[in-house]
């Protein structure tokens, strides 16, 4: 149930929230980017993300990522447990966190990046940044074992991680070409309101 609430934040929640804030000519593209990034994040999570974040630790590098032992969810069945939870439940719940984190980045580059570019960039970020950091903070890796970290509601893995990626992308892309010359009023604040309500409901599961 909590996983479904987190998924609700990604689609349609954050798609509606961002879509309403963009200009009318970009609303569909923005929502499509959120949906595509969400779907890609879930696929990458199953293929390699979960293994990097929570898979069996392998050697010295185990402090930084979990390894390749559970790629494609290998070795996990309906009897597998993660703590007291069925491991498939844990996979879905953590996959929802990965997906919402990826969707957050879209807002930093909206109206300024090609569809293919955002997919490639976020895909690389999931594999090389999100999953390893999730392992280090939540999966018993370096940060958790050395600093005894407390990550409240994804403050580090989700929010700081996605914010740094989004800010970096915004700096690389630079200002919008029409900034200051063309009105950039939000397309539909009613849609944004609905998205914000869905995000608020989803936060009950997120937290």
Give the ranges of each region predicted by the language model:
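Hydrophobic alpha-helical transmembrane bundles of multi-pass membrane proteins
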Residues: 1-206
